[in-house]
């Protein structure tokens, strides 16, 4: 039985980046943030992971305020600390130092009722790569349409 339940997925990341490798890590959240994420009220736009002072942080992730929350509601764009082993952090740091690589959140999922983040080690796609993918998708769609109506 699979105990991982996908909450949200960053579909734009797969289109805009080549994902070299994925790393799973925990995230430090406040109570209202947990409720908002479980209600799927978050946006991945322009979010990225960074390494500051030997700590792993998730930046620019927009988690909407919980509508039932009161004055103790969270700040929507605050940086959130990611929990990862030190060895893994050192390995990610080496990737980050290479030119062209960035760390992007790929998905949020539940593992035994704990929210986890999957961070991808990504390299940006060029415009011609994106066009090629769109061209291949349209060809596949046309072929399936022709097969369906024959």
From Swiss-Prot:
Gene3D superfamilies linked to this entry: 2.40.280.10
Location relative to the cell: Cytoplasm
GO BP field: trans-translation
GO molecular function terms listed in the Swiss-Prot or TrEMBL record: RNA binding
UniProt similarity note: Belongs to the SmpB family.
NCBIfam families: PRK05422.1, smpB
Name of the protein described by the UniProt record: SsrA-binding protein
Gene behind the chain: smpB
């Amino acid at each position: 039985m699979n105990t991982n339940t996908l909450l949200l997925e960053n579909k734009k990341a797969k289109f805009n980046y080549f994902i070299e490798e994925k790393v799973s890590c925990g995230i430090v959240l406040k109570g209202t943030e947990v409720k908002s994420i479980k209600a799927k009220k978050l946006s991945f736009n322009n979010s990225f992971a960074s390494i500051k002072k030997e700590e792993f942080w998730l930046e620019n992730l927009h988690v909407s305020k919980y509508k039932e929350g009161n004055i103790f509601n969270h700040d929507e764009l605050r940086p959130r600390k990611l929990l990862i082993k030190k060895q893994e952090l050192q390995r990610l740091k080496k990737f980050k130092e290479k030119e062209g690589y960035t760390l992007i959140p790929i998905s949020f999922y539940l593992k035994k009722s704990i929210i986890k983040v999957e961070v991808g080690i990504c390299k940006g796609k060029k415009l011609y790569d994106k066009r090629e993918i769109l061209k291949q998708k349209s060809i596949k769609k046309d072929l399936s349409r022709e097969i369906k109506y024959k």
